[in-house]
Amino acid sequence: MKWLSRILTVIVTMSMACGALIFNRRHQLKAKTLNFNHKALTIIIPARNEEKRIGHLLHSIIQQQVPVDVIVMNDGSTDETARVARSYGATVVDVVDDTDGKWYGKSHACYQGVTHACTNRIAFVDADVTFLRKDAVETLINQYQLQGEKGLLSVQPYHITKRFYEGFSAIFNLMTVVGMNVFSTLDDGRTNQHAFGPVTLTNKEDYYATGGHKSANRHIIEGFALGSAYTSQSLPVTVYEGFPFVAFRMYQEGFQSLQEGWTKHLSTGAGGTKPKIMTAIVLWLFGSIASILGLCLSLKYRQMSVRKMVALYLSYTTQFIYLHRRVGQFSNLLMVCHPLLFMFFTKIFIQSWKQTHRYGVVEWKGRQYSISKEQ
């Protein structure tokens, strides 16, 4: 069995080498104090049955050091979303129904929201997002100014978890970030064409010039289409990590919601990662199974060194935790038991593949969307 021990050691070592390459380029926001004596921007929040989440976002907006307008686009909510939003002083606008079925996801609400914005700068923020610091919006504006107040800026919020099951989102969140290509030196450095969806900042002129969310009207995950629309007009598209300014808490409704959400995400958003980066990601993830396999076999066969296999497992686990700490706050127990996370990721991946290629339909928040129509 010594030969198997050597093979597994080589596999895990190669896996960790790939892990060192998939997220070795950082894109972090830089804080700076700005002075505004007028409304700095309009924040547009698409919301459908978000009464349990939107209050946290609106409270964090009130705490910001710069004055902003807030528009909540109420997309057919059947709960108290509108009442909660008004209690924080937000303007609530009901989304006009899409009777023709031409729009998917939140793009319809976002596009209508721009017509109500009174500032040139506009930001689209998901209802489950929270600004962690009082200078968060200020920092976003500063970063946008650094790119000449042109194009599109997007942020992937830091993922905060409170209940154990929420930690099963760990690998998905890391893949969302590294799958954007630009966080790896394996990227060829060409113009970025993709954007994160939870937080985006742009200006009206560029928004309408590119078609804005109209270019993503058939997309459930709108970030890729939005980024491509801006790139096609030779406008800059930038992506940033949220910590320590922006965070979100996902799928508070329960484990079923988490499964449905990531199935939707993988069904519609897994095609933008470049092949060599995707290969490195797959090889890195495979190290999770290889390391636990070596550990289990060493406990059964004396020819394999338990000490070496434990060291191998702990080495991979250390890197696994290190990379995930950049994108979120997850259960230490789940981080150590990463093979469970890998198996869950694989299960959802297979499920999303079936929905995409066999059924062609994905369901989210009580609505069904045909993936086959999505371009």
Curated annotation (Swiss-Prot):
UniProt-listed Enzyme Commission number(s): 2.4.1.-
Pfam families xref list: Glycos_transf_2 (PF00535)
GO terms for cellular component: plasma membrane
CDD domains: Glyco_tranf_GTA_type (cd00761)
GO BP annotations, alphabetical order: carotenoid biosynthetic process; protein N-linked glycosylation
Domain of life of the native organism: Bacteria
Topological type in the membrane: Multi-pass membrane protein
Subcellular location: Cell membrane
Keywords of the record: Carotenoid biosynthesis, Cell membrane, Glycosyltransferase, Membrane, Transferase, Transmembrane, Transmembrane helix
GO function terms (MF aspect): glycosyltransferase activity
Family annotation (SUPFAM superfamilies): Nucleotide-diphospho-sugar transferases (SSF53448)
Enzyme class: transferase
Metabolic or biological pathway, per its Swiss-Prot or TrEMBL entry: Carotenoid biosynthesis; staphyloxanthin biosynthesis; staphyloxanthin from farnesyl diphosphate: step 4/5
Transmembrane segments: 3-23, 164-184, 277-297, 330-350
Protein function: Catalyzes the glycosylation of 4,4'-diaponeurosporenoate, i.e. the esterification of glucose at the C1'' position with the carboxyl group of 4,4'-diaponeurosporenic acid, to form glycosyl-4,4'-diaponeurosporenoate. This is a step in the biosynthesis of staphyloxanthin, an orange pigment present in most staphylococci strains.
Family membership: Belongs to the glycosyltransferase 2 family. CrtQ subfamily.
Name of protein: 4,4'-diaponeurosporenoate glycosyltransferase
Annotated organism of origin: Staphylococcus aureus (strain NCTC 8325 / PS 47)
